[in-house]
Amino acid sequence: MTTSSNRPTPGGPTQPVSYPVFTVRWLAVHALTVPTIFFLGALAAMQFIQR
């Protein structure tokens, strides 16, 4: 059973929520994107290598 004290009141004062900076999602996203961007940069750089 839910009571009215559990629900936020519309228009009432709300407490600011502090979220952690590093989360599992943040680590997973950056563990994939950082090497991907590095790899794409390496591929782009290799296009300018002259024989």
Curated annotation (Swiss-Prot):
Picking any one GO molecular function of the record gives:
heme binding
Specify whether Heme is a keyword of the entry: yes
Q: Which domain of life is it from?
A: Bacteria
Q: Name one GO biological process term.
A: photosynthetic electron transport chain
TM stretches of this protein: 26-42
Swiss-Prot/TrEMBL cofactor(s): heme b
Would you tell me the protein name for this molecule? Answer: Cytochrome b559 subunit beta
Its source organism is Gloeobacter violaceus (strain ATCC 29082 / PCC 7421)
Give the source lineage, highest ranks first.
Bacteria, Bacillati, Cyanobacteriota, Cyanophyceae, Gloeobacterales
Record gene name: psbF
